[in-house]
Amino acid sequence: MTDETVSLDAALAGDEAALEELLARVQDDVFNLALRMLGTVPDAEDATQEVLIKAITRLSSFRRESSFSTWVYRIALNHLATYRKGLFARFPVSFDIYSEDIVSSRERDVPDLSGSVDRDLLARELKLSCMNGMLQCLDAEGRSAFVLGTMFKLDSRVAADALGITPEAYRKRLSRARARMAEFLSTYCSAAGSDACRCERRIDYAIATKRIDPVRLDWQSLKRVEEAPDGERIGEPASESSAHAGDVETRTDAMERLDDAAGLFASLPRYRCPDGAASFIKDLIASGDFKQAVGDRPERSARPWTCKEH
């Protein structure tokens, strides 16, 4: 019997500590998935709470046909694909909108708005904001495939299971999304070799258009996932060779662009679930009102977490 099975059985029997342990194993992944799917820190934090609540209230419906984390991914992806409260749901973006904004050169007319904040710090904030915003230019299907394959590096079978599609369909979605992202990056982004757009040049324009706030650096305030024992950061490529496998000299230009795009996004930091979201869930589990809402029963009754999935 695995530790996961033991924790699941205990959680279903009403053990709050076991339920907290289960959620602690997946909450960072849920938050990072929400970040990439929604594009802003506040929206990701709110959505993470909602996804974890769904996982709690649907726990009794988990058939254990996949790992607990894959099951939670499925809940998260379904929730995030239809999330309508976020910034980018209200103000959609596209690669055409991004490119028009870049070629307009509007940043040239904006004065220095950085104040006393270090401009290198602001440039890093803008890069993170821009790249996560860029993901929103992909449709929900392409974005989910791109995030799972490029950033989470899930096996195609696991990713397909989480998305509820075949591995073949998943690979096609991933390939299309990677090609579209690579095309845009190679044309416009300095990180991919183009001089059309550089974060350093667009800091003041980003402040003026409220892309970043110099007094509230959301991305810089997040805590990164700890490093693995060998010194590599968990969730990032172990080395240049593993991130870009294959003989560089024999690859086509198209494949190089795909690998460059994948490498840029794969190297983005992975973050801890914010304390506010984690504490909210912990307090909710311990709440008498919440237990009653999800079907808590008298002490001798088993399986209190039995709210049916709708």
Question: Which residues does each predicted region cover?
Answer:
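Intrinsic, short, N-terminal disordered tails of RNA polymerase sigma-factor systems
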Residues: 1-9, 21, 88-144, 154-167, ...
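A short, charge-rich alpha-helical start-of-domain segment used by transcription regulators
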Residues: 9-31
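Sigma70-family region 2
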Residues: 12-13, 37-40, 50-67, 86-89
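Amphipathic, Lys/Arg- and hydrophobic-enriched alpha-helical face
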Residues: 23-41, 58, 84, 131, ...
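C-terminal flanking helix
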Residues: 27, 31, 52, 80, ...
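Structural recognition of an alpha-helix C-terminal capping motif at a helix-to-coil junction
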Residues: 32, 46-53, 57, 66-78
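Helix-turn-helix DNA-binding helix
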Residues: 44, 55, 170, 174-177
